[in-house]
Amino acid sequence: MEKATVNQQKSGPDKTVETKTRLRCTPFLLFDGNCAEAMTFYQKCLGGDLTLTKLGDTPMKAQFPKEKHNRIINAHLKSGAIDISAADWMASPDFEPKRGNMYAIFVIGKTYGELKKVFDKLKYGAEKNRFQDLHDMPFGIYGQFYDRYGVQWIFKGDNKK
């Protein structure tokens, strides 16, 4: 069994708290319609198992126009210690993909509680215009924001609240 580590982190301006976590962080890449092509290329180079899920194959398709239904909503490449997640861009034209905003840190956990503890610490000073609090989605728990340093954090939990 994996041993939890103890870290000291600041939450808010001057508050230090002790945190134990079993969360995993992996790179998360965003593509503009070519996620399947890119991730297939990475699989050919790195080996491993690749899972691709199209938006049109999920209940979420009703929330998007048909022209986005072939976009990848979830891609996952696992090869030994290599673990990369990705998706095609689904955001509005006001926030189009460009170099520099096509990556994120993907925080993966099992329960709402363990995600919420870290989410609430990291969101301090986060940008408000792209903030999504943790909420239930068809695939589990989801939330995202850009922190006060401009880094995008995406949270996903296996279980719903």
Model-derived regions: residue spans:
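Core segments of cupin and vicinal oxygen chelate
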Residues: T19, L29-A81, Y142
